């Protein structure tokens, strides 16, 4: 198995554990606390995600970009020093942020701050809620940095182990905390999931940390652009709609939209997590000036992700009418239409992560900042114009439209400015096969009309997708070879089945190559 494939699989395991922790926690909160309290927890978690980019200072992006770059160019000592240097910067930033937050609480009063954080639902236990908010922001900043650092160091096995332990800690703590202490207990459970990666981050800052002045300027410039981009991107990608829904429609609408987003995130996490090794690999190739290798890997990554994310997203949208109530309860059935819209379009946002990795590998974080600024302005405009009038569905369609705009800008930049090619024809073929798959799954759901139809719908959709790949000639010869090599890493029983499937979907391509000119 190639190093890139192994790292991608381990990165997917690590990210999958993180995604499952968030997903299972959201179900636990919904089942134990009810709709209004679920909205309050989702609102606080959104505030945490909004605050973290301010604390991070773009350092997570910098460590994930420059560590593999230095290692790819053979500068291992400089890489180790930079690792410790950036870890210290982040810890100092988090410490300063905690002090500033404490001063703000002292100035405005813990009750006022707690009421704002919970959207007015916190009447008691205001001090624990405020303290938890500060702990969550600092812990999430350290956690995000830790996983970016481990990806940059290409220690994906360690990342997977930490994520697995954190999954168990968070889910068990959220369940227990929700049952015993309500909203504050649930939030304490989320904080428990950040404990291990935070300790790892703190332990990484000890030792020599001096770096070359030229490198320091490059890293600082890159980090500052990423900082601005991450802050503005948070408005577009980190659920800014919750703020407007809370203000105009109340916590019940916040809960509905949060549940819709939770299912969307679950659907895209698997394919998206395979991109965890893309930035490190592209940056490493950039360090060797291997532009042809970068072009080939970019196109292959887009095709591979499209092959995975299209059937998953479209298929999930097809089964959501039965899946969502089965997971969260009938109280959340109003979230079904928004969830179907968000999941259907989420596939394109996953593909855009490959383009973002490419842009960062080429140190063009200035474009990420500029495009994020444009998206943030559109998100704020939609929040004031659409959400007050149309509620949850207005938030869903606004999110989709803005993300499509951002993706369009990114594709234009990759093609016109960077000179890379997007495999449009291959992506369209994969999309067609996935739509046929989703149609088959939807028919099963509509005919049976019961949660028991979900397994049947998944099997039918998968079968139609495999046949569709062969019919539309969607698998490229190079991708077929990649799939064949990948099957050899599986257990023997699974490897034989996977090899037969890979041979089936790529048979038409092979036959075409055997025909005489």
Give the positions of each predicted feature.
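Helix-loop junctions and terminal segments of transmembrane helices
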Residues: 57-73, 87, 152, 260, ...
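Hydrophobic transmembrane helix module of multi-pass membrane transport proteins
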Residues: 88-235, 442-443
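Interhelical loop/hinge segments that connect adjacent transmembrane helices in multipass membrane
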Residues: 1-4, 199-238, 277, 281-296, ...
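Signature of the first transmembrane helix
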Residues: 3-69, 98, 102, 136, ...
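Transmembrane helical elements of multi-pass membrane transporters/channels
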Residues: 7-23, 189-197, 213-284, 304, ...
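Membrane-proximal transmembrane or re-entrant/amphipathic helices at the cytosolic face
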Residues: 442-517
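Membrane-interface helix-loop junctions in multi-pass transport and translocation proteins
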Residues: 30-37, 154-157, 167-199, 366, ...
């Amino acid at each position: 198995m190639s190093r890139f494939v192994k790292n991608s699989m381990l990165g997917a395991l690590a990210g999958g554990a993180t995604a499952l922790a968030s997903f299972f926690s959201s179900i636990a909160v919904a089942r134990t606390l009810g709709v209004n309290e679920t909205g309050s927890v989702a609102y606080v978690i959104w505030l945490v995600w909004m605050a973290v980019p301010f604390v991070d200072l773009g350092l997570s992006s910098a460590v994930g970009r420059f560590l593999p770059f230095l290692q790819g160019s053979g500068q291992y000592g400089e890489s180790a020093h930079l690792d410790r240097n950036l870890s210290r910067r982040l810890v100092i930033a988090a410490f300063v942020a905690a002090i500033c937050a404490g001063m703000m609480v002292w100035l405005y009063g813990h009750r006022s701050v707690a009421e704002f954080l919970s959207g007015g639902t916190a009447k008691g236990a205001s001090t624990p809620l405020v303290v938890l908010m500060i702990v969550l922001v600092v812990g999430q900043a350290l956690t995000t940095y830790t996983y970016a650092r481990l990806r940059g160091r290409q220690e994906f096995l360690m990342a997977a182990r930490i994520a697995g332990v954190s999954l168990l800690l968070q889910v068990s703590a959220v369940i227990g905390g929700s049952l015993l202490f309500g909203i504050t207990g649930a939030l304490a459970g989320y904080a428990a999931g950040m404990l291990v990666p935070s300790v790892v981050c703190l332990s990484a800052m000890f030792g020599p940390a001096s770096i070359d002045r030229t490198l320091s300027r490059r890293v600082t410039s890159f980090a500052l652009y990423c900082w601005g981009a991450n802050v503005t991107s948070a408005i577009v990608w980190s659920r800014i709609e919750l703020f407007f829904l809370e203000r105009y429609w109340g916590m019940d609408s916040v809960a509905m939209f949060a549940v819709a987003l939770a299912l969307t995130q679950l659907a895209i996490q698997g394919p998206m997590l395979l991109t965890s090794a893309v930035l490190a690999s592209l940056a490493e190739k950039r360090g060797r000036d291997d532009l042809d290798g970068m072009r080939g890997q970019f196109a292959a990554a887009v095709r591979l992700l499209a092959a995975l994310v299209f059937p998953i997203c479209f298929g999930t949208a097809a089964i959501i009418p039965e899946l969502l109530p089965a997971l969260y309860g009938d109280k959340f059935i109003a979230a079904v239409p928004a969830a179907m819209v968000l999941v259907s379009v989420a596939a394109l946002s996953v593909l855009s992560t490959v383009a973002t990795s490419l842009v960062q590998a080429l140190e063009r974080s200035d474009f990420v900042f500029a495009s994020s600024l444009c998206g943030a302005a559109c998100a704020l405009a939609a929040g004031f114009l659409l959400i007050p009038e149309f509620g949850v569905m207005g938030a869903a369609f606004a999110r989709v439209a803005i993300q499509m705009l951002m993706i369009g800008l990114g594709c234009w930049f990759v093609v016109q400015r960077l000179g890379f090619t997007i495999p449009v024809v291959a992506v369209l073929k994969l999309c067609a096969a996935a739509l046929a798959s989703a149609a088959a799954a939807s028919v099963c759901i509509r005919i049976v009309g019961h949660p028991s139809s979900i397994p049947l719908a998944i099997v039918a959709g998968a079968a139609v997708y495999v046949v569709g790949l062969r019919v539309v000639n969607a698998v490229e010869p190079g991708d077929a070879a990649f799939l064949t090599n990948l099957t050899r890493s599986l257990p023997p029983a699974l490897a034989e089945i996977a090899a037969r499937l890979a041979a089936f979907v790529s048979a038409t391509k092979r036959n075409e190559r055997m025909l005489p000119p």
